[in-house]
Amino acid sequence: MNLIQLKKWFTILTFVLTAFLVTRTAIAETSPYVLMQQAADKLFSDIQANQSKIKQDPNYLRTIVRNDLLPYVNLEYAGSKVLGSYYKSTSAEQREKFFKTFGELIEQKYAQALTNYSNQKIQIESEKELGDNNFINIRVNIIQANGVAPILLYFKWRKGNKSGEWKVYDMVGAGVSMLEDTIKNWVGILNKQGIDTLITKMQQSASQPIIFNQ
């Protein structure tokens, strides 16, 4: 390769890397309100487009959640809250297994919750000034038909210290925090039987099939 060709390829590489970095920066600086709308639009449009497939196999909701919702969820932050003070005493291998299983459990929980969706309208609150806040709650109204009171959900978002990316770490509905409820359900097993047993039992719960309530 001669000097001219080398300079040409160097210029192309510089352009590609610059474009990549600009894209990453744009993603990191994207408002959580914008991300919330993006996630909701993709999630519910895919649910609507795949109704026949979902009715035939409700577990397909897990695939939709995995593809459309989990990329917006900070599983490591939420999972570390479940482990609490045990985090530092676990091995890298144990943590890897735990976070994988924890992600599958959250996937199952969200997919099961979405069996209650039946073409309701989703209304996300108007964007507020973020300021220097690294944590924010975003209210989402699920508008019901026939004048039934809307279902209020609050999605808790956190801005990563290093990445600068906003991600969800908890959802609150009817005054119940999914994260706190998860901690409450599993902390006893973690305290008494250790993380390996916790992982095994979480795997059992995560493998539960998605079912529609009759």
Swiss-Prot record:
<comment type="function">
    <text>Involved in a phospholipid transport pathway that maintains lipid asymmetry in the outer membrane by retrograde trafficking of phospholipids from the outer membrane to the inner membrane. May transfer phospholipid across the periplasmic space and deliver it to the MlaFEDB complex at the inner membrane.</text>
</comment>
<protein>
    <recommendedName>
        <fullName>Intermembrane phospholipid transport system binding protein MlaC</fullName>
    </recommendedName>
</protein>
<dbReference type="GO" id="GO:0042597">
    <property type="term" value="C:periplasmic space"/>
</dbReference>
<dbReference type="Pfam" id="PF05494">
    <property type="entry name" value="MlaC"/>
</dbReference>
<feature type="signal peptide">
    <location>
        <begin position="1"/>
        <end position="28"/>
    </location>
</feature>
<comment type="similarity">
    <text>Belongs to the MlaC/ttg2D family.</text>
</comment>
<keyword id="KW-0732">Signal</keyword>
<keyword id="KW-0574">Periplasm</keyword>
<dbReference type="InterPro" id="IPR008869">
    <property type="entry name" value="MlaC/ttg2D"/>
</dbReference>
<dbReference type="InterPro" id="IPR042245">
    <property type="entry name" value="Tgt2/MlaC_sf"/>
</dbReference>
